[in-house]
Amino acid sequence: MACDFDITKENIYDYIIEDTPGADEAIKALSGICSQRADSQWIIAHGELPDNRQLNISSLGYFTIPKLYGLMEGDADISALDEIGALRVLGQDNLQADGSNVLIGYVDTGIDYLNDVFKDRLGNTRIQAIWDQTDKTGTDVANTYAHFGRVYEKDEIDRAIEADNNGENPYSYVAQRDTSGHGTLMASISAGSYTDGYVGVAPGAELLVVKLKQSKQYLRDFFLIKDDVPAFEESDIMLALRFLEDYAIRLGKPLIIIFGLGSAN
């Protein structure tokens, strides 16, 4: 059953169901439950939390509860680019190994799309699309991939960059921001353009970005995660991966995924 309510609300729980024979029919038979497919094997379902906001593991099964992922933290050392031979490879034009005609997808905290390291030589964005899962504007016409958030496509991002160049507010066109900086760091290391003496591993690649929304409070409570610690739901990550795959198929280009999150589960 398609979702016709806001599945990002705190009183809506999410769970992951393996698509075994009869699973889809069983979900459709339940009232107040909607679902969307993560891939050919897994279904993400959504329903209203009980009044006590407690998860009944015995009836749901532990594996159906989305696990939480955090940011992989560490000092960024760009000297590693030389140590792995990336800069030497880029210096050999005959290899054509700069990532051209390849998509790199990011599932993280978003991206600073105004940064010059994500623009081509003409000043246009190299980002093909950004799915901002946190966006609640409700005006998205491009997001046919999931039932929440907003997808900003290349022409919109270029329009925002042009506005910024003209002294206007770019975020009135593309509201997405990377307030953490983690996603921007991951993208700049792996795909930064030649800028002020810096270059990433694949400066010719195009980018697809998913800004994950923060996990719901009931899952933080269940896994004893502090409120000030970034935490992201497994179900949102699965949908993000589907978005990247679907968009890459739409563009007809190979896809590499950078995933800078981790979990103790």
Role assignments for model-derived ranges:
Residues 241-265:
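Short acidic, glycine-rich surface-loop motifs adjacent to enzyme active sites
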Residues 91-235, 252-256:
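Subtilisin-like serine protease catalytic core
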Residues 49, 73-78, 134-140, 239-243:
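Short C-terminal domain-edge/linker segments immediately following a structured domain
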Residues 190-194, 240-245:
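Short, well-ordered amphipathic alpha-helices
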Residues 1-103, 110-126:
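Autoinhibitory propeptides
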Residues 10, 18, 25, 48, ...:
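Glutamate identity and glutamate-enriched acidic tracts
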